[in-house]
């Protein structure tokens, strides 16, 4: 279902470039579709069981699958032309961890690169579905400001059937939190 209904809504009309980082790849529901659109996919998955299934399902020379954490990624600055995170941020245990993941996404993107995400809205059904796991929904009203604070420009938030997509582009400017740190260091 993910590749048939959700991915076109998230990805269509956005140039992904040549190398996509897929965060929270899970068992690979979106990985194959991403590979149809770009020449290289790097999939990052925190759960070792899901990573094992991902590797078994998608063993291709153009896919690299790694175990890792979105809040501290093992990649050089500017490594990816785009980053895709489908149903990832609400699994992080605090707003601070969500913001750290957003900052990491900004860091690993090339200038001009796109960040594309989908999240689910807060509500009793989504809470019930996550009763055994972390569910800290991203507030779509604050997403715009949080992405801008990380340095992203051209941010859009669009709603559809109990979910929303985020689209943002990495600017060439230093993130707002970096400017604030630099200013406080200069006055110290």
In which residue ranges do the predicted regions lie?
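Short glycine-centered segments of the SAM/dcSAM-binding site in methyltransferase folds
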Residues: 19, 112-114
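C-terminal alpha-helical "lid/dimerization" subdomain adjacent to the S-adenosyl-L-methionine
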Residues: 114-167
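Conserved alpha-helix/loop element of class I SAM-dependent methyltransferases that forms part
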Residues: 1-18
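A short His-aromatic
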Residues: 90-94
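C-terminal lobe and adjacent flexible extensions of AdoMet/dcAdoMet transferase-like proteins
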Residues: 167-188
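A conserved beta-strand element that flanks and buttresses the S-adenosyl-L-methionine
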Residues: 84-85
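Class I SAM-dependent methyltransferase SAM/SAH-binding core
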Residues: 21, 26-72
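A short glycine-rich, Lys/Arg-flanked "PGG" loop and its adjoining helix->strand segment in the class I
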Residues: 99-111
């Amino acid at each position: 279902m993910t590749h048939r209904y959700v991915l076109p809504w998230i990805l269509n009309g956005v140039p992904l470039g040549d190398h996509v980082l897929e965060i929270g790849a899970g068992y690979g529901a979106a990985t194959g579709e991403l590979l149809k659109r770009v020449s290289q996919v790097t999939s990052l998955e925190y759960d070792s069981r899901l990573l094992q299934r991902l590797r078994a399902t998608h063993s291709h020379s153009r896919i690299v699958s790694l175990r890792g954490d979105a809040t501290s990624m093992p990649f050089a600055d500017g490594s990816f032309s785009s980053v895709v995170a489908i149903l990832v941020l609400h699994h992080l245990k605090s707003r601070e961890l969500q913001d750290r993941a957003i900052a990491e996404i900004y860091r690993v993107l090339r200038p001009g690169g796109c960040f594309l995400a989908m999240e689910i809205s807060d509500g009793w059904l989504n809470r019930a579905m996550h009763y055994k796991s972390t569910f800290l929904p991203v507030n779509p009203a604050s997403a715009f400001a949080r992405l801008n604070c990380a340095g992203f420009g051209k941010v859009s938030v669009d709603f559809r059937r109990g979910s929303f997509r985020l689209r943002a582009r990495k600017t060439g400017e230093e993130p707002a939190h970096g400017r604030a740190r630099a200013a406080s260091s200069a006055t110290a």
